[in-house]
Amino acid sequence: MKKLFLFFVLVCAVVLSAGEKLPRYIILFIGDGMSTPQRMMAEEFARKTGRGELIINHFPFHASTRTVSTSSLVTDSAAAGTAIACGTKTANGRIGVTPDGKIRFESVAELAKKKNYKVGIVTTMTINHATPASFYGHRISRSQYYELGVDLVNSDFDYFAGGGVAFPTGKPAKKGAPAPKLPNIYDLAAKKGYKVLKDKKAFMALKPGSGKILYSGAPGRISAAIDAGKEDITLAELTAKGLELLKNEKGFFLMVEGGTIDSYGHGNEAASNLREVLALDDAVKEAVKFMKKHPQDTLIVVTGDHETGGMTMGFAGSGYAMYMDRLAHQKVSISKFGSLLKDARKAKKDFSYADVQKMVTRYFGLQFTGDPKKEPMALSAEQKKALEAAFQKNRLPGTLKLIMNQKAGIGWTTGAHTALPVLTTATGAQAKRFSGFIDNTDIANILKSLLK
């Protein structure tokens, strides 16, 4: 099936190059914190574990993409999101405005709406987070969550889906302070004609003609890919439903963000990070299915806003060896394991290091017996000593994360962003325009030029 997908993508590229027309359906995917290292880590993991190649890495057109903001070589998501959405640079922290906040930029989504296209915004994070907000918001600070929520409501876009709206009644003045009681964003949305949904079953039952949608799949963000159960909504499902609801004769613009890639980049957590990239790839597959039905009318672009974590494939401790398949042994995110560990301590008064060893083996595949030179997941004497010390100091999750990175051969240089260029790939109508070396502002400006 994977080979058929890739074959179809390449055939589309050949057919369209002969006489392309402007696309009616424009689908932009953004991996927050996703640069080439994250793409390739996920690719190698997928190959080693039998999943196959990532479709995002095998689109026919590629462009190395510069991400610098006006205030720093190292951008944040607000400035990068604004550049990708609006085609103009700004300073870190700004959303859809100049560095001084005096001039508003028009995003490709807003222009599409003005030209009577339907518009959708999807993310794994809160819908008023920096990247998605860059397509409809205009604020001096990305932290103005409530005000960005108001911008969301006033955008009149057709489809919003993700982790809900952060601080729907206002952000507390300081940590621990009570939240303000401003008019609830969800109530404002309903008054503006949005159908506000929080139930997955009701959401999945939506059909074309349902009207404007604001769907909150979970409070804060949808479940991490590594932790998600069958009952949890996925980015692929949010994307597929968006494609279904937005389709019309005029066309649509849909932006889909894999926002949680960034979260696990900041945390330097390889296993969870790569699974978010795979989740984004699954969402892109839904777009490719759609393109198969509308091959000459669809453009799919996949990019990142910046790199997060300074991730490297290979580090001093592993030399020239890498073992990406070892990350398959990790069954939960580090934060989820922390919660499980806390619950286990509460449930058993005499909870001991022997108890935690069983949990470590169950959720990470690490073995406390055996020779690490012969058994890949066996712990060395130093690693066992580090884990026991971490258990005594209540720092076990962080030490487990470090050991799993070491086992795979993954290194990290920072808990913040880096200035690495990102990779942009594209397929479909006019995809050839995303080639060579470009700036992130070029993405919006190219897409704007394709709107009729």
Model region roles, listed by residue range:
Residues 1-4:
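Positively charged n-region of N-terminal signal peptides that target proteins for export
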Residues 89-157, 164:
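Extracytoplasmic mature domains of secreted/periplasmic and thylakoid-lumen proteins
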